[in-house]
């Protein structure tokens, strides 16, 4: 039925070839002049899901993530072309380069999502998201990826909303 109205269905699963990059950033992501702060907040939420635990991220971990988010977007922000959009692996590599022990813990927690069996979100976006009707099909993500998938889809919807508002 969705396709009958010319909607686009994006299937996201470990075996799908449709990819959404959680690191995608729209320069109009925020109403103010600092889209990077909102994106950093999103990445903090993503890392909190990945790291788990009842206490969430420690203050030092949050600081390290925020620092790495600002570093990972430098190339893209200086020349905003799709080829320079970072992916999770870029964040992972930056975390591994940091001297803090907490950074190594975060990188280790991200490893399964970068190099392991759950790497479905370690790709550049390869689907067109500009259709007026987009359905994100995440039913095949599985228990380990479902919450992460929901968070990433929510961020993509927000990206689209900000694009629509700035048009």
Language-model-derived ranges and their functions:
Residues 1-14:
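Glycine-rich phosphate-binding loop of nucleotide-binding enzymes
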Residues 14-22:
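Interdomain hinge/linker at the junction between the two RecA-like core domains of SF2 helicases
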Residues 3-5, 22-167:
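P-loop NTPase motor domains
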